[in-house]
Amino acid sequence: MAEPVAGLLLAAGAGRRFGGPKALAELDGEPLVLRALRTLAEAGCAPVRVVVGAAADEVLALLPDPSQAVRAEDWEAGMGASLKAGLTALEATEGPVAALVHLVDLPWAGPDVLARVAAHASTETVARAAYDGVPGHPVLLGRRWWAEIADAAHGDRGARDWLATRTDLRLVECGDLGSGRDVDRRADLPGR
């Protein structure tokens, strides 16, 4: 990763279908929030911020550095509120040319996936992982677009509507590195 890229982990959801906040769920004895933070760090992202909402105090208690946390006060409004809170917080940081947006419920997207997408960083980048041609996460957003995306982010669609308008969106094929599969229900985790 030549240009500095911030990591933005969205982990504020209540996990209604899951039966509780996914950030607190464990895979191989590790909470998903810590696994995702480690993955962002191993991919070379710095700084890394984690957006919290549901069970915020419990998630904060797990973080090795609570200053990484950004509270999305209106997290119940959906992923858009979390994305807005995270991008707004990153605006105050100097250095990163782009933000790599990662979701807490993607434990099988490893650092190699994240690093491959992050390698396309620039202030004007709009890129996302694809798995066998199907768009997925993480999503790389150049700093130039952060305020515009924060204004457009709403509901559970996050940046989806904004991304749909982009003719410059680059799909970065990662199907050889992972599946992009997410955790929707507890049964999606091994041993459940």
Feature names for model-found ranges:
Residues 26-28, 148-151:
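Short, flexible loop segments at the rims of nucleotide/cofactor-binding pockets, characterized by
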Residues 1-3, 151-192:
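Conserved alpha/beta core of the MobA/IspD/sugar-nucleotide pyrophosphorylase nucleotidyltransferase superfamily
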Residues 136-148, 186:
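Conserved nucleotide-sugar donor-binding
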Residues 2-135, 143, 167-176:
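Nucleotide and nucleotide-moiety/phosphate-recognizing core
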Residues 113, 145, 155-159:
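Internal, well-ordered alpha-helical segments in soluble enzyme and binding-protein domains
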Residues 108, 140, 182-183:
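Short aromatic/basic micro-patch
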